[in-house]
C-alpha cells in the first residue's frame, strides 16, 4: 500500500516539476507615447500617459516565450493644443519572444506579435466619436536582469500599431493612427 501511495505521489508531482520555471509574471510602469498621424487633420494629437501594466509570459522552450500584456490608459485628444476630450483604450498584446541567453544574469529578448485595441469610455466634444476598434502589429525588445534566483528587474520597449477612425456626427472625419512607443520598467518573478 505504501509503495502504491508513493508511486501515486510521484506521478502527481510530475506535472508540477515539468512546469517549474515555465511562467513569468511582470508588473511594470509604462509610458504610452503615441506617434500620431492623421489622414486629414494636421495638429490632431493624443497625450502620452504613464500607467501600470501586468504581463504573463509562458516559456514553451528555454529560449521561446509567449507574452500577454494587459494594461489600459486614458488619453486626452487635442487639435492644435485645444482639448477635444478624452478616451480610454484597452490594447491587450500577444507577442512571441526569443530570449537570447536563457540562463545568465542578463537576459535580453526580442518579440513580435499582434494587438487588439478596444476603445471605451469615449468622452469627446459633441458630435465626435471613435469609429472602430483596431487590430495591429507589435514589436518589442527588452532585458530581464536577475536580482534574486527568480526575481528580475525588467526594461522593455514596444512599438504597437493602433488605427481607428474619428467621426463627426457619424461621418468619417479622419483616419487616426496612434501607433505608440511603449517604454516600461518593472519587476518580474519566474515560477
Task: Please report, for each region that a protein language model flagged, where it lies by residue.
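Gram-negative (and chloroplast) outer-membrane scaffold detector with strong preference
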Residues: 21-22, 55-124, 134, 183-191
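Hydrophobic membrane-targeting alpha-helices
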Residues: 13-17, 99, 147
Amino acid at each position: 500500500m505504501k509503495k502504491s501511495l508513493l508511486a501515486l505521489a510521484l506521478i502527481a508531482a510530475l506535472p508540477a516539476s515539468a512546469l517549474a520555471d515555465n511562467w513569468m509574471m511582470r508588473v511594470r510602469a509604462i509610458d504610452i507615447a503615441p506617434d500620431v498621424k492623421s489622414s486629414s487633420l494636421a495638429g490632431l494629437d493624443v497625450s502620452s500617459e504613464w500607467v501600470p501594466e501586468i504581463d504573463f509570459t509562458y516559456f514553451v522552450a528555454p529560449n521561446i516565450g509567449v507574452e500577454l500584456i494587459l494594461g489600459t490608459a486614458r488619453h486626452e485628444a487635442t487639435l492644435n493644443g485645444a482639448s477635444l476630450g478624452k478616451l480610454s483604450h484597452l490594447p491587450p498584446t500577444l507577442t512571441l519572444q526569443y530570449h537570447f541567453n536563457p540562463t545568465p544574469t542578463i537576459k535580453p529578448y526580442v518579440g513580435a506579435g499582434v494587438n487588439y485595441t478596444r476603445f471605451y469610455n469615449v468622452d469627446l466634444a459633441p458630435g465626435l466619436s471613435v469609429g472602430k476598434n483596431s487590430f495591429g502589429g507589435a514589436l518589442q525588445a527588452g532585458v530581464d536582469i536577475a536580482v534574486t534566483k527568480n526575481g528580475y528587474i525588467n526594461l522593455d520597449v514596444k512599438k504597437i500599431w493602433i488605427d481607428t477612425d474619428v467621426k463627426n456626427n457619424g461621418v468619417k472625419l479622419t483616419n487616426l493612427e496612434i501607433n505608440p512607443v511603449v517604454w516600461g520598467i518593472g519587476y518580474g518573478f519566474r515560477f
